[in-house]
Amino acid sequence: MSKEKILRTDGNVSRSGAVNAESYDAWASEYDRELANWGYEAPEQAAGLLKGHLEDFRDAPILDCGCGTGLTGLALRAAGATGHLTGLDASRSSLETSKQKAVYDRLEYADLNKPLPLGEGAVGGILCIGVLTYLEEAAIFKEWLRVLRSGGVVVFTSRDDFWQSRGIAEMLNRLELEGRWEALHVSRPMPYLPGHPDFADKVKAVYGVYRKS
């Protein structure tokens, strides 16, 4: 199945927007059900982290970067976010599913490996959950810093096996040393899909929380 191209424990994952969009398009109709069966709670965890670290969480404009079928949008609204919520994703079928949840103010197709269709300082918060695996990290970090206003907060997940092997920790630390942002929280590796037969023990998630200077 197409999802097997993206749920890989060996880390051999494509960063092609077109390839991954095709896989998620094929999976969109079953995505929510299967993720629930696998005990997926990352959206709720991430929304809670943003709420705990973003002072004006309730009213701030927020970007769901790689919104997929809208699970993170639902979690944000359930956590009390009432501000303008933008969802961007490269899977058109996932966007259609997300639209049915009626939690976003703006939903738009976007290749997240290209500049984000937002102005400088447009949002106060960003969530990027389960998406960094498919992106060029250095480029998306710079884009987050561009679209975040000063004092804005980004919460993201990274596969624990990529944290060092892809140099993610080093990139984050370099940007912090440059004074671009401040690390507020970096979690230990956490269960990501605890009910998945392959992911449960082999792949965990690190949650990062950073505030723009």
Model-predicted regions and their roles:
Residues 116-126:
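A short acidic, Gly/Pro-enriched loop at the edge of an enzyme's catalytic core
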Residues 124-138:
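A short SAM/SAH-binding and catalytic strip from SAM-dependent methyltransferases
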Residues 139-150:
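A short glycine-rich, Lys/Arg-flanked "PGG" loop and its adjoining helix->strand segment in the class I
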Residues 180-213:
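Class I S-adenosyl-L-methionine
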